[in-house]
Regions:
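Conserved ABC ATPase "signature" region
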Residues: 111, 115, 122-139, 192
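Catalytic Walker B motif of ABC-type/P-loop ATPase nucleotide-binding domains
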Residues: 169-172
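The feature captures the beta-strand-to-loop junction immediately N-terminal to the Walker
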Residues: 52-54
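Helix-to-loop junction immediately C-terminal to a conserved catalytic motif
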Residues: 67
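Conserved signature/switch motifs of ABC ATPase nucleotide-binding domains
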Residues: 143-146, 164
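Short coil-to-helix segment of the ABC ATPase nucleotide-binding domain corresponding to the Q-loop/switch region
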Residues: 104-111
């Protein structure tokens, strides 16, 4: 197991580069509140990176800045060497909350991004069907979101993100609302899709075991004002199966990351002894 200092080593051509990123906002009494400060991170092409940290440390804000949904106070984000100033089709965002359109069928939901992109109907629907098949929902393409389970809806969200063929997928706790068994099934489904698509993924989670199971690297945020406390390179061979979560090496990673964030978690929820 390798834990490295907060600032990552430079790579030749990172897919995502974050440099000196800072986010502040004005509190109720007009005081300046710093969410995070001096965040530096490189993410390589096809890499799966998970971010963990205590509640309120700015994980969601961080990936929204990478997507261009939220402006940084200072610092910069680069995708393929170009500075991010707004959302673009090279990035897709999968939200924690269900973001499917209830009046659209599953097929129409998956095809929506292609429609916005201006792809012709004759091209976008075969593409949407291909992705629906990839996530195992071919029998449900004419159904509406309310007719699907939570896990099935998140598969549709993933298919919709993949439909526009982004280079980067940003995922904000997409399995948080699912029960434990469904969450584990979705973790395996996500790895299966990622192994075939080889997209670059940044994935936010509060679940340490989920981060270790999915990631090539786990980035650990400190409590607010956040910095990158450490990065853990997960040296567990792929392909991974759920049974690996019971292995001594996996549990060693869980313990190491928990030791890094335990005090910050108690601080973030204001629990004192």
């Amino acid at each position: 197991m390798k834990s490295r200092p907060a600032e990552t080593a430079a790579v030749s051509k990172p897919k995502v580069s974050v440099r000196h990123l800072c986010k502040t906002y004005q509190g109720r009494n007009r005081s300046e509140i710093t969410v995070f400060n001096e965040i530096n991170l490189d993410v390589n092409p096809e890499e799966f990176v998970c971010i963990v940290g205590p509640s309120g440390c700015g994980k969601t804000t961080f990936i929204k800045i990478i997507d261009g949904l939220v402006p940084a106070t200072s610092g910069s984000v680069y995708v393929n060497g170009s500075e991010v100033t707004e959302p673009d089709f090279d990035r897709a965002f999968v939200f924690q909350a269900d973001s499917l359109y209830p009046w659209r069928t599953i097929l129409d939901n998956v095809a929506f991004g292609l429609e916005i992109k201006g792809v012709d109907r004759k091209e976008r629907y075969p593409r949407a069907r291909e992705l629906i098949k990839r996530v195992g929902l071919s029998r449900f393409e004419s159904h509406y979101p309310h007719e699907l389970s939570g896990g099935m809806r998140q598969r549709v969200n993933l298919a919709r993100a993949l439909a526009v063929d982004p280079e980067i997928i940003l995922m904000d706790e997409p399995f948080a609302s699912l029960d434990a068994q469904t969450r584990e099934v979705m973790q395996q489904e996500l790895l299966n899709v990622w192994s075939s698509s080889r997209k670059t993924v940044l994935f936010i989670t509060h679940q340490i075991d989920e981060a270790i199971y999915l990631a090539d690297r786990v980035i650990v945020f400190s409590a607010r004002p956040s910095t990158i406390k450490a990065e853990i390179r997960v040296e567990i061979p792929r392909p991974r199966r759920l049974s690996v979560k019971r292995s001594p090496k996996f549990l060693e990673y869980v313990g190491a990351i928990w030791n890094l964030i335990e005090s910050d978690i108690f601080e973030s929820v204001s629990i004192s002894e």
